[in-house]
Amino acid sequence: LTGVKFDTRRITFSSNINDVVKESDTLIFVTPSPYLKAHLKKLKTKIKDKFIITAIKGIVPDDNVIVSEYFTKEYGVPPENIAVLAGPCHAEEVALERLSYLTIACPDKDKARIFARRLGSSFIKTSVSDDVAGIEYSSVLKNVYAIAAGICSGLKYGDNFQAVLISNAIQEMNRFLNTVHPLNRNVDESVYLGDLLVTGYSNFSRNRTFGTMIGKGYSVKSAQIEMEMIAEGYYGTKCIKEINKHHHVNMPILDAVYNICLLYTS
């Protein structure tokens, strides 16, 4: 967001997480998932009575749990006090005030609606859902599939092939969600399919960029160094692979990304 000007008079900056938590009723977490645990180690203030919103598109490594479950398990935050913010919403376009649609998921839909009203604006439209786990898992998987799309791009596969790839990716996502968290959901909604499409195709997508570099022959480490940004899908691939050992869902695209990025590319 280096090209965006912010009104710093309306922003309070702090490097002390405990000071921020003490003064806030609602906490929004956007820390990349690989660093969440280390970041929270500094936390001494109880958060179980706070309203937690996570915009993290990853799974907590080692624990292999989605972020909402981690806050409940480790910090005693009731599920009804945790919401997930998701959807096709690249920060670059939001900062430029381009029309975007976000979904706020929470077991307590009334709380989701309250936050949705606060978040909404002339260029931010919102909807609410109670599919917290499904949306968190889909937010992880779409990054994995964006890496796959990037790899195909780096290998000079055409648009025809990538269309087939994404078509199969949404089916694979649906199989996984229906197995891990069965619910009457429509994966054609923007928070699932829309987020997958924008992450798989957009030039703003870090995961697609990472995959493109891998497809061009970069090692994982060299791609990460050159990008200077976190591609959550790399870490999410390993976590979902571990989780799927307990569910045995047929996931050939996930397996391909895992084999390329974690087995054969160093």
Where are these regions (language model features)?
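Rossmann-like NAD(P)(H) cofactor-binding subdomain of soluble oxidoreductases
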Residues: 7, 14-22, 26-97, 115-117
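Interdomain hinge/lid region at the active-site interface
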Residues: 145-146, 151-258
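General beta-strand structural signal in soluble alpha/beta enzymes
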Residues: 54, 81-86, 126-130, 188, ...
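Glycine-rich phosphate-binding loop and adjoining beta1-alpha1-beta2 segment
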Residues: 1-4
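Conserved small/polar residues in nucleotide/adenosyl-binding loops
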Residues: 264-265
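Internal alpha-helical scaffold of NAD(P)-dependent oxidoreductase catalytic cores
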Residues: 46, 73-81, 99-186
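Fold-independent oxyanion-binding glycine-rich loops
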Residues: 16, 31-32, 55-57, 85-88, ...
